[in-house]
Amino acid sequence: MDLGIAGKTALVAASTGGLGLAVARALAAEGVRVAIVGRRRDRAKEIVAELQAAYGTGSFGTSGFDAVAIEADLTTPEGIESAVEQTIADLGPIDILVLNGPGPKPGAAATLSSEDIAAAFDLLVKPQHALVSHVLPGMRERRWGRILAIGSSGVTAPLPNLAVSNTGRAALAGYLKTLAAEVALDEVTVNLLLPGRIATERVTQLDHAAAKRRGTTLEDIQLESRKTIPARRYGEPAEFGAPAAFLCSAPASYITGVALRCDGGLIRSL
């Protein structure tokens, strides 16, 4: 299927690793001009070199694939503004915005402080809102845009010992669902992609933390976790990138306001 997005420009937040990188790779494979944004400049440059070697600058024509490395702290207003401005300067107006961010610290709901609640919004809501605010007006004016947020299965099935994440991501989901209805007439879609247990560094860190907390081994934790997944395995990052690219595509123009699960059947609710 031709996804119809070759030559479009995407800013992919926190894309120097994990799920953000998986989405960036999937978009690059479709000929999208991709801004690799993160705090690790050297890593961002490595990824750009990798993508250019794989797909070649302009391999989809004069308006085709390219990539740029942008060092920015997207938890700050200055970092957000810089990332948006540099993406536009180097690659053109932003057609696709992929919202993503670092996972907050683990912790139980019963022991959350007011500072923890504030941190959930500072990390998982305010930066994403700021990015949307910078990019959305141009999308509406051009009457084409895709906003995709990388969420968590905790949005629909709160995860144990991740109270800050569950709180902040649920708030973001509410904002995005509301926004989707407001901008649909402008041909801008807004969606959320919910990963289950995808084999990323973040998931491994959480498994290590669980093993330490319970006094067992990483292997035992992962075996136990796999048993809760109907597919009986963790997903591969590329298996997350593929549906992400589709939700950012031209054929997905009638899909908006959804929270799509990519979880191997992990979430049991309807």
Question: Whereabouts are the PLM-identified features?
Answer:
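Short C-terminal tail/terminal secondary-structure segment
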Residues: A157, A245, T256-L270
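Catalytic Tyr-X3-Lys loop
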Residues: G103-K105, A110-V132, W144, L148, ...
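Conserved glycine-rich Rossmann-like NAD(P)H-binding loop of the short-chain dehydrogenase/reductase
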Residues: V32-I47
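Catalytic loop of short-chain dehydrogenase/reductase
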Residues: L148-L172, L176-L185, R197-I198
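Active-site loop immediately N-terminal to the catalytic Tyr-X3-Lys motif
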Residues: A110, A157-A163, R232, A250
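Alpha-helical segment proximal to the catalytic Tyr-Lys
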Residues: P137, A181-E182, S253
